Amino acid sequence: LIIGTSGRYEFKNKGIDVFLESLNRLCRDKNLKRDVLAFVNVPGWVGDPREDLQARLKSKDKFDTPLEVPFITHWLHNMTHDQVLDMLKYLGMSNHPEDKVKVIFVPCYLNGRDGILNKDYYDLLLGQDLSVYPSYYEPWGYTPLESVAFRVPTITTDLAGFGLWVKSLKKQNGIDGGVEVLHRSDYNYSEVADGIKDTVSLFLSLIHISEPTR
């Protein structure tokens, strides 16, 4: 399963913090049977694309040893003070081969010329199975709207204008309908993290049900 979040580097407002927390909880869930690849597509103080990663991508060999700092596609000018990297370290996430959840942090603008992915944002969005935008503050929020427009189911919150609009439709909403709107407040960070984890798990079960038997 490929999931992802994106947007400006507003660590709390965009819900990047709670997204990472949910990934950590999902990784520790013993009931998780499928691999999850989670992208954090958020432009940071980006430096150069990683030459060691470029070399591996060009090589026809297979590698079983992780690179140094196995989360990141491009070096940052503030490697020791980046909030995403700091939180991944705090959570103890490491992208070990045995981990069911692995995180890829893409800290550059996706314009098709970044030197690693060389895809624009919408190409990457189309490659995802699910998007997550757990905003703490968002007057409207185009990212979940764009996700749905590209037929990629999304998770958002009722602190985003788009999430409030979906709830106002008074129709049954949920991830099986394309949009899961989680309640978010100043005091329910942990509940939101669990809500994301549980919604991803539910989505995995829906995919399993819809898959043809072999």
Language-model features: locations:
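Residue-level detector of conserved catalytic or cofactor/ligand-binding positions
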Residues: 207-213
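Donor-sugar nucleotide-binding helix/loop cap in glycosyltransferases
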Residues: 147
